[in-house]
From Swiss-Prot:
This is Indole-3-acetate monooxygenase. Pfam families: Acyl-CoA_dh_2, Acyl-CoA_dh_N. InterPro entries: Acyl-CoA_DH_C, Acyl-CoA_Oxase/DH_mid-dom_sf, AcylCo_DH-like_C, AcylCoA_DH/ox_N, AcylCoA_DH/ox_N_sf, AcylCoA_DH/oxidase_NM_dom_sf. The lineage of its organism: Bacteria, Pseudomonadati, Pseudomonadota, Gammaproteobacteria, Pseudomonadales. The keyword ATP-binding does not apply. The gene is iacA. Transformation of P.putida KT2440, which cannot degrade IAA, with the iac gene cluster confers the ability to grow on IAA as a sole source of carbon and energy, but not the ability to chemotaxis towards IAA. It comes from Pseudomonas putida (Arthrobacter siderocapsulatus). One of its GO terms (molecular function) is acyl-CoA dehydrogenase activity. It catalyses: (indol-3-yl)acetate + NADH + O2 + H(+) = 2-hydroxy-(1H-indol-3-yl)acetate + NAD(+) + H2O; indole + NADH + O2 + H(+) = indoxyl + NAD(+) + H2O. SUPFAM superfamilies: Acyl-CoA dehydrogenase C-terminal domain-like, Acyl-CoA dehydrogenase NM domain-like. The keyword Oxidoreductase applies. Its EC number is 1.14.13.235. Involved in the degradation of the plant hormone indole-3-acetic acid (IAA). Catalyzes the first step of the pathway, the conversion of IAA to 2-hydroxy-IAA (2-OH-IAA). Can also convert indole to indoxyl, which spontaneously dimerizes in the presence of oxygen to form the blue pigment indigo. Keywords: Monooxygenase, NAD, Oxidoreductase.
Length: 389
């Protein structure tokens, strides 16, 4: 598996094989029965199955028992899971957590993965809450929203702004056992219901400084993956969820197109010329966006493997291709629903779920129009806004 994982191109061992296909079939069946949406989180046995497959150790360094996969290999795995269910793919995407945790002291990282390279991390960053500096570290109190996957996490991270007198230092993330945080089930949305992106509440917990880090800080790991643009990767693992959802929508439409009889007596969907035109346009749009997405990843990864810094113009394409993929995916899912007619409007319709899930992906702050503004500025030779690269 290792040699395949290190390849820059997709089609890795993590995204294929009989055991993985069986896992996806199970996730798909349970999603269609409404299990994840109804309970508003991914079931613990599914998280355990993700662990067994290697979702959470995929990007962990080999020295800690991980697989050290490439960004493309990881993204393709998340895309395949998202094809089975968008919420499951979103939760699985937090297997990218080594990107964040790499900024912890090396001894802390070793302790986390010494317990298990399959450790599941989740958390809420915003808004950073003021933390009192006390003996032994930081005393933390607060509430954090959008803590996706926290119901199945082993450890969680919360955003803090340490208070030094009347001054607040740089925002940090504090890492603590899941048992020291309370989850308030506030996640009630039109899509991605199964992500369980509830509120995290922490009350009077002291966290040692060695269990905190500045988000986006210099990594303390030197494996190739940790030279890949971290903010770009954080966006990519989410936008690739949209690509998987959109592919599921087109596959669902194709499966129903020949057998569906119109109540008006019109020809089957597959026999309608305008439907043929529209589905071809949707396929072209999705395949083009996907190609741009993976091409950008591979180009950046080539620089990493060569030992060179990733140029800013390449990083710009990572950000642009990521937002573009999410936007196109949502449009494609909606096109598939439109072509399905009234069939696609029922709550139990997989197409309806695809549309809602894909739209929620586009609502993430990473996928806003500001990406296009920054990318366009760079194409004109101007500087992007702070925090873009």
């Amino acid at each position: 598996m290792d040699s395949l994982c290190l390849r820059a191109a997709p089609a890795s061992a993590l995204a294929s094989g009989p055991a993985f296909e069986a896992l996806l079939d199970g996730v798909r069946d349970r999603a269609r029965l409404g299990e994840f949406d109804r309970q508003r989180h991914i079931s613990r046995d599914v998280i355990d199955a993700f662990k067994a497959h290697g979702v959470y150790r995929a990007l962990v360094p080999k020295r800690f028992g991980g697989l050290e996969c490439s960004p493309a290999a990881f993204c393709e795995m998340i895309e395949r899971i998202s094809h089975a269910d968008g919420s499951a793919g979103w939760v699985a995407s937090f297997g990218m957590s080594p990107v964040y945790l790499a900024a912890l002291p090396l001894e802390t990282i070793a302790e986390i993965y010494g317990n298990s390279p399959d450790t599941v991390f989740a958390g809420g960053i915003f808004p950073p809450q003021a933390a009192e500096i006390v003996s032994g570290g930081f005393k933390i109190n607060g509430r954090w929203k959008y803590s996706s996957g926290s119901m199945g996490a082993d450890i969680v991270g919360v955003g803090i702004a340490p208070r030094n007198g009347d001054k607040l230092d740089l925002p940090r993330l504090a890492v603590l056992p899941r048992s020291q945080a309370r989850i308030e089930e506030t996640w009630d949305t039109v899509g991605l219901l199964g992500t369980g992106s509830h509120d995290l509440v922490v009350e009077d917990v002291v966290v040692g400084e060695q269990w905190t880090f500045v988000r986006g800080g210099k990594p303390n790991l030197d494996e190739p993956f940790f030279r890949y643009p971290s903010l770009s990767f954080a966006t990519q693992v989410l936008s690739v969820v949209g690509l998987g959802i959109a592919r599921a929508a087109l596959d669902e439409l194709s499966g129903m197109a020949s057998g569906r009889i119109s109540v008006t007596g019109a020809p089957a969907l597959a026999d309608r010329p305008l439907a043929q035109v529209d589905v071809a346009k949707a396929e072209a749009a999705l395949r083009s966006a996907r190609a741009f997405f993976y091409e950008s990843i591979e180009r950046a990864w080539e620089h990493v493997l060569a030992g060179d810094p990733v140029p800013v113009d390449v990083t710009n394409l990572l950000r642009l291709s990521s937002t573009h993929a999410a936007r196109v995916a949502a449009e494609v899912a909606r096109s598939a629903q439109m072509l399905s007619g009234m069939t696609g409007i029922y709550n139990e319709s997989p197409l309806a779920r695809c549309v809602n899930d894909a739209q929620v992906v586009t609502q993430h702050a990473f996928m806003g129009d500001v990406t296009y503004q920054n990318a366009g500025a760079m194409f004109f030779g101007k500087q992007p806004l702070p925090g873009y690269l």
